Regions:
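Ankyrin repeat (ANK) tandem alpha-helical domains that serve as protein-protein interaction scaffolds
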Residues: 1-202
Length: 202
């Protein structure tokens, strides 16, 4: 398969249609992806159809990033069908014309708080209110803490209450919050407001 890819890239008389058909017959998604990335004459529709059928999310993602022509709507739907939050997240980083809303809903449906956190930290578009509502359901306090460090919008009061609820599992992350400037400043403001309210009542 490596030889077919090299020949399709360098030999002027190479039959690219037959070459792609042979790569598809051999069933290697990496080589179909490489052919689409390097061949000057490539049937992108057939290449995508082959990658989709092979069901390898990594090379669907890579094709969406590097191929000159790629149906990103269909590509995202295939990643969602494959239930792979990692490559849905990666596609949001690197694909042009990406449907962030559709991808976010997929991450929520998959229930993967790790990649909801990563999306909130790194995607160009993200629904922070809905994302926080999903994040706060988790018992994985690491991602609640990290989101407070990196998300542009974050409800520190609700997050802190969540970390207090998990007395033992949240202990490490409450300690880290005190050591992190953004968390520390947010908590100071929250407690100052609470003390002012208590003072006004007394």
């Amino acid at each position: 398969s490596d030889e077919i890819v090299r020949s399709g890239r360098s030999e002027p008389d190479f039959d690219h249609k037959a070459g792609l058909a042979e790569l598809v017959r051999r069933g290697g998604p990496r080589h179909v992806y490489l052919a689409g990335a390097y061949w000057k004459d490539f049937d992108y529709a057939s290449g995508f159809k082959a990658l989709s059928a092979m069901g390898d999310p990594e090379y669907i993602y890579r094709a969406g990033w590097y191929w000159k022509e790629f149906n990103r709507t269909a590509g995202l739907e295939r990643l969602i069908e494959l239930k792979n939050p990692r490559y849905i997240f990666y596609a949001g980083l690197d694909w042009k014309g990406f449907d962030y809303g559709r991808a976010f809903q997929a991450l929520v449906s998959l229930g993967d708080v790790e990649y909801i956190f990563y999306a909130g930290a790194h995607w160009k578009e993200f629904d922070y209110e809905a994302g926080f509502d999903e994040l706060i359901k988790t018992d994985r306090m690491e991602y609640v803490y990290k989101a407070g460090c990196l998300w542009r919008r974050f409800d520190f009061l609700r997050a802190w209450k969540r970390m207090e609820y998990f007395v033992d599992d949240g202990e490490e992350w409450r300690g880290r919050a005190f050591d992190h400037e953004r968390w520390r400043n947010a908590l100071r403001l929250i407690w100052d407001e609470l003390w002012e309210r208590e003072g006004a009542r007394s």
